[in-house]
């Protein structure tokens, strides 16, 4: 089982996302279920190491968002065109 630490995003938009990526983080979102969507930010290196394993895409993951655990599955992963970097992930509540 994978456990990923996340923080709720305070800013949104292109400029805020670029600042996150410069700080070695990237934006993501959690949606689905009866709760409202949550915009989050993740540590790039931590997630990059986890997503190298095939189980990352098929198993239920645990996101710890500000101390609260959320069970999710990776829905869509966006990558940089030619660099080995993640730019965004969509998570669906499990």
Curated annotation (Swiss-Prot):
Annotated InterPro entries: Rbsml_bL25/Gln-tRNA_synth_N, Ribosomal_bL25/Gln-tRNA_synth, Ribosomal_bL25_short, Ribosomal_L25_dom, Ribosomal_uL5_bac-type
Record keyword Translocase present: no
Entry-linked SUPFAM superfamilies: Ribosomal protein L25-like (SSF50715)
Annotated disulfide bonds: none
Classification via Gene3D superfamilies: Ribosomal Protein L25, Chain P
This protein's GO CC annotations: cytosolic large ribosomal subunit
Domain of life: Bacteria
Subunit structure: Part of the 50S ribosomal subunit; part of the 5S rRNA/L5/L18/L25 subcomplex. Contacts the 5S rRNA. Binds to the 5S rRNA independently of L5 and L18.
Family recorded in the similarity comment: Belongs to the bacterial ribosomal protein bL25 family.
Function summary: This is one of the proteins that binds to the 5S RNA in the ribosome where it forms part of the central protuberance.
Xref: NCBIfam families: PRK05943.1
Protein name: Large ribosomal subunit protein bL25
Organism: Salmonella gallinarum (strain 287/91 / NCTC 13346)
Gene coding for it: rplY
């Amino acid at each position: 089982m994978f456990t990923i630490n996340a923080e709720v995003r305070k800013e949104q938009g292109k400029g805020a996302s670029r600042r996150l990526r410069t700080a070695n983080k990237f934006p993501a979102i959690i949606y689905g279920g009866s709760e409202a969507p949550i915009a989050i930010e993740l540590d790039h290196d931590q997630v990059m190491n986890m997503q190298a394993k095939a189980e990352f895409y098929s198993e239920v993951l645990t996101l710890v968002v500000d101390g609260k655990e959320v069970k999710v599955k990776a829905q869509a992963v966006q990558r940089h065109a030619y660099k080995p970097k993640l730019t965004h992930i969509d998570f669906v509540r499990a």
